[in-house]
Amino acid sequence: MKNLTDSFVFLGHWPSAGSFGFNTDILATNLINLSVVLGVLIFFGKGVLSDLLDNRKQRILSTIRNSEELCGGAVEQLEKARARLRKVEREAEEFRVNGYSEIEQEKMNLINAAYQNLEQLENYKNETIHFEQQRAINQVQQRVFQQALQGALGTLNNCLNGELHLRTIGANIGILGAMKEITD
């Protein structure tokens, strides 16, 4: 009876007829079936697997090449950018130096022009002062001369009588006659 019940228990574990299933119990499977399945998998799977690996390898190599090309392009662009930066820095330094020297030159030109203007103004001032002094001196001399002349005329008119007047005229005529003889 025990055998009979064991038979029924095993029937419950077996797959039904016409269906396909895997027996995961290694000890219960047939080694020949396993070797056949593994052989078929290796034979057919090897090509598929090698194709998959080759494709993956090609994609990886292509990605590496693209990355290297991009890296090379980036390095080239970086070098160009550095060269442009150095050029711009040199130009900026030249502009800065030239700008400072031009500013200094312009500053010196303005200072020199200011000194020249000051010298001209000083000369004009001195000339104006000298001119005004000469004019003042001339005015004073004219006034002194006029006053002296008026004083002399007043004195002469007071002191001069007819006889003295005739003697003065005679003396002057004598001087003029002597001068005429010398010039002839």
From Swiss-Prot:
Keyword match Transmembrane helix: yes
Gene Ontology cellular-component annotations: chloroplast thylakoid membrane; proton-transporting ATP synthase complex
Subcellular location as annotated: Plastid, Chloroplast thylakoid membrane
Assigned keywords, A-Z: ATP synthesis, CF(0), Chloroplast, Hydrogen ion transport, Ion transport, Membrane, Plastid, Thylakoid, Transmembrane, Transmembrane helix, Transport
Membrane topology summary: Single-pass membrane protein
Main function: F(1)F(0) ATP synthase produces ATP from ADP in the presence of a proton or sodium gradient. F-type ATPases consist of two structural domains, F(1) containing the extramembraneous catalytic core and F(0) containing the membrane proton channel, linked together by a central stalk and a peripheral stalk. During catalysis, ATP synthesis in the catalytic domain of F(1) is coupled via a rotary mechanism of the central stalk subunits to proton translocation. Component of the F(0) channel, it forms part of the peripheral stalk, linking F(1) to F(0).
Protein name: ATP synthase subunit b, chloroplastic
Organism: Nymphaea alba
Lineage: Eukaryota, Viridiplantae, Streptophyta, Embryophyta, Tracheophyta
Encoding gene per record: atpF
